[in-house]
Amino acid sequence: MGIGSYHEPVLAAEVLQLLVRMPGVYVDGTLGGGGHSLAILEELERKGFLADSFLIGIDQDDHALKAASEKLSGFSGSTAIIKGNFSAIAAIVRKISAERHFTDSVAGILLDLGVSSAQIDTPERGFSYMRSGPLDMRMDPEAESSAADLVNTLSERELVTLFFRYGEEPRSRSIARGIIDYREKHGSILRTEELAEIIRLREARPDRVIKTLSRVFQALRVEVNRELEVLEQVLADGASLLSAQGRLAVISYHSLEDRMVKSFFTAQSSSDWGPRGVGLTEPLKKAEFAVVTRKPVASGQQELSLNPRSRSAKLRVLEKLA
């Protein structure tokens, strides 16, 4: 299997500035090739925090775990690399904390959502409409259902709902009809290029083809990996793990993710003033968190020129109050 390379971590300087502010336990819930984790460890070392700090890296991709282990080998005494989904972040932190005999509250958590360049650039993973490969899209290769399973078993109505809900694709009905027609005439759709061709034939405007392909492939990937369901859980569990002044940093890449992150951060940073019209002088419950980034942080021109895939990245940060 050809393995893609891991790009430079997105918004690395901004992550370090906003996340690494004190010694303690840090969690990289989306370890990938280890780029962000290495930067965090080096920043902890530069600030003199490393001796009193520890980093837990989580990923469900064996290739990512191998790459990260090699990249972080110089900090092996200060890291634990765990195979798993970040939906289990609370259990993983508790387990490592018990084994290492340190507190299970954390100073910082980073979640870099979406697909890594290595996954996109590896044809056998089936994430990209630009590469010929099996229609897979599983971030955990051992997971049961692939994108091909969805494309070949869902009804037309279910496909329409999927593409509209998770891809926000306006031509969902036409594309779903195209898939059903193909299945009836040719059988199963098993390759990325087969699905891409069906989509191209259903998009009348050439200038919209790339966006349509992106939306449909995104919708399938989100469903295969239960991305929004998992994100909802990890946001809640991650926030609950933070120590006083600890921070949760999330990098999102599409509007569905960003809206969910923004909504969660807003809810967590809002005090409870009870029903309208009660006229309380103090809230029933004060907010336990504060939003650090009133507007999401985006990549600058220099980063965009070096890594065009960072163009849609948005960084939001939440802090646990004392």
Curated annotation (Swiss-Prot):
Major localization class: cytoplasm
Chain residues that bind S-adenosyl-L-methionine: G34, G35, H36, D59, F86, D112, Q119
Keywords carried by this UniProt record: Cytoplasm, Methyltransferase, rRNA processing, S-adenosyl-L-methionine, Transferase
Pfam family, one: Methyltransf_5
Annotated compartments: Cytoplasm
SUPFAM superfamilies: Putative methyltransferase TM0872, insert domain (SSF81799), S-adenosyl-L-methionine-dependent methyltransferases (SSF53335)
Similarity annotation: Belongs to the methyltransferase superfamily. RsmH family.
Full protein name: Ribosomal RNA small subunit methyltransferase H
Native source species: Chlorobium limicola (strain DSM 245 / NBRC 103803 / 6330)
Gene from which the chain derives: rsmH
